[in-house]
């Protein structure tokens, strides 16, 4: 468990906001880090691992034309994933207040020519939407770990807005 996850849960809890997580390259690691914190269930509604490109469209509602034109590693894809997961994990007809997403290339190869370590993180809150691009280095595990930490920092920054 991480201090970043504890800080995210505390910040969301202070606002009375809930969280949904959509992951691609992190493969559930972000959600696992969050649920390692006792009391996470007061904030986290759920998560989706949309690893395959078609799942981003069918489950999270990412635009098929966007995926066809730009592939799964794109800032707009990250934004649509973050927005889509809010509805997917919503309870009682109400979406999660905050959605966060990770999409990128952990390596060792790049299927679409973008550099290994390219990561886009999307965050959608009731007051703002944002994506941030990162270029991490290291092996597959290091890139995934850096993406998890960056996603948590991005949620904290967005919640502070």
Where are the regions a protein language model picked out?
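Short alpha-helical segments enriched in small residues
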Residues: 1-161
């Amino acid at each position: 468990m991480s201090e970043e996850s504890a800080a995210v849960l505390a910040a969301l809890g202070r606002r009375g906001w809930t969280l949904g997580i959509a992951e691609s390259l992190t493969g559930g690691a972000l959600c696992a880090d969050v649920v390692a914190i006792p009391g996470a269930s007061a904030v986290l509604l759920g998560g989706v691992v949309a690893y395959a490109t078609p799942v981003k469209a069918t489950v999270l509602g990412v635009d098929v034309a966007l995926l066809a034109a730009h592939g799964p590693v794109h800032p707009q894809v990250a934004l649509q994933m973050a927005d889509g997961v809010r509805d997917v994990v919503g309870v009682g007809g109400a979406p999660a207040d905050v959605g966060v997403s990770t999409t990128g290339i952990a390596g060792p190869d790049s299927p679409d020519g973008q550099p290994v370590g390219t990561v886009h993180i999307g965050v959608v809150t009731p007051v703002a939407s944002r994506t941030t691009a990162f270029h991490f280095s290291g092996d597959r595990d290091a890139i995934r770990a850096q993406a998890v930490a960056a996603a948590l920092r991005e949620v904290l920054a967005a919640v502070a807005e």
